[in-house]
Amino acid sequence: MMFTDWHEAAIGKTHNRMNFDCGDADLNQFLQRHARQNHEKGTTKTYVALDNSDVTRIHGFYSVSPASLIYAQVPGAISKGLGRYDVPVFRLGRLAVDKSMQGQGLGAQLLLSAGKRCIQAALQVGGVALLIDAKNKQVCDWYKGFGAVPLNDQPLSLLLSFKTLYAALSASGRL
């Protein structure tokens, strides 16, 4: 089942961050204490999935920022054809879904939304992939299900190429 009764917005003061609970204290704390401030300062941008009938209720969120990787860290499938210098990417710093919404496909939708946002930015400033730091093997395997590949030297850090994301966005009619 795919949950579709939501819309995305930049995090703001009117959004009820205190009632969000994804089951992970660190992610909850980031949303409650740091996400909006970081967004306003420009260090990391956070976007929230809001309930269409209650625009203060946060169902999920993701945070992104620009980053780069040393060429040697990047798997060959992504580095092929690139110059041998730092590889421009976007870091998916956090992605979480409220416990009440887990298992309804919102996490996948947020991943695609983050990918689309970063692809659009990359058209202006460059970038080839989404860099993901998985918290554990289970989360790592979830991202691998979308085509993410581990970095050469860090098995819980993955790259999801914009080529793969673009294909998924096209297939889902989200471009």
From Swiss-Prot:
Changing K80E: 54% toxicity in E.coli. Loss of tRNA-binding. It is an enzyme of class 2 (transferase). Gene3D superfamilies: 3.40.630.30. Changing Y143F: Loss of toxicity. Reduced tRNA-binding. Loss of tRNA-binding. Induction: TacA3-TacT3 autorepresses its transcription at low TacT3 concentrations, at higher TacT3 levels it derepresses transcription. The tacA3-tacT3 operon is up-regulated 5-fold in a relA-spoT-dependent manner within 30 minutes of phagocytosis by mouse bone marrow-derived macrophages. It catalyses: glycyl-tRNA(Gly) + acetyl-CoA = N-acetylglycyl-tRNA(Gly) + CoA + H(+). The gene is tacT3. Toxic component of a type II toxin-antitoxin (TA) system. Acetylates tRNA and inhibits translation. Acetylates only Gly-tRNA on all 3 Gly-tRNA(Gly) isoacceptors in situ. In vitro acetylates mainly Ile/Leu and Gly. Overexpression during the lag phase of a tacA3-tacT3 deletion strain leads to a 150-fold increase in persister cells in the presence of cefotaxime and a non-growth state in the absence of antibiotic. Persister cell formation and the growth defect are neutralized by cognate antitoxin TacA3, but not by TacA1 or TacA2. Plays a role in persister cell formation. The TacA3-TacT3 complex both represses and derepresses expression of its own operon. The hexameric 4:2 TacA3-TacT3 complex binds promoter DNA and represses its transcription; both subunits are required. The octomeric 4:4 TacA3-TacT3 complex derepresses the operon. The shift from hexameric to octomeric complex probably alters DNA-binding, leading to dissociation from the operator DNA and derepression. The C-terminus is an important element for recognition by the cognate antitoxin. It comes from Salmonella typhimurium (strain 14028s / SGSC 2262). Its EC number is 2.3.1.-. One of its GO terms (molecular function) is acyltransferase activity, transferring groups other than amino-acyl groups. The keyword Transferase applies. Belongs to the acetyltransferase family. GNAT subfamily. The active site is at Y143. This is tRNA-acetylating toxin 3. InterPro entries: Acyl_CoA_acyltransferase, GNAT_dom. Homodimer (in absence of antitoxin); has a condensed and elongated form. Forms a complex with cognate antitoxin TacA3. Forms a 4:2 antitoxin:toxin complex with cognate antitoxin TacA3. Forms a 4:4 antitoxin:toxin complex with promoter DNA, where 2 TacT3 dimers bridge 2 TacA3 dimers. Only TacA3 contacts promoter DNA in the octomeric form. TacT3 may contact DNA in the hexameric form.
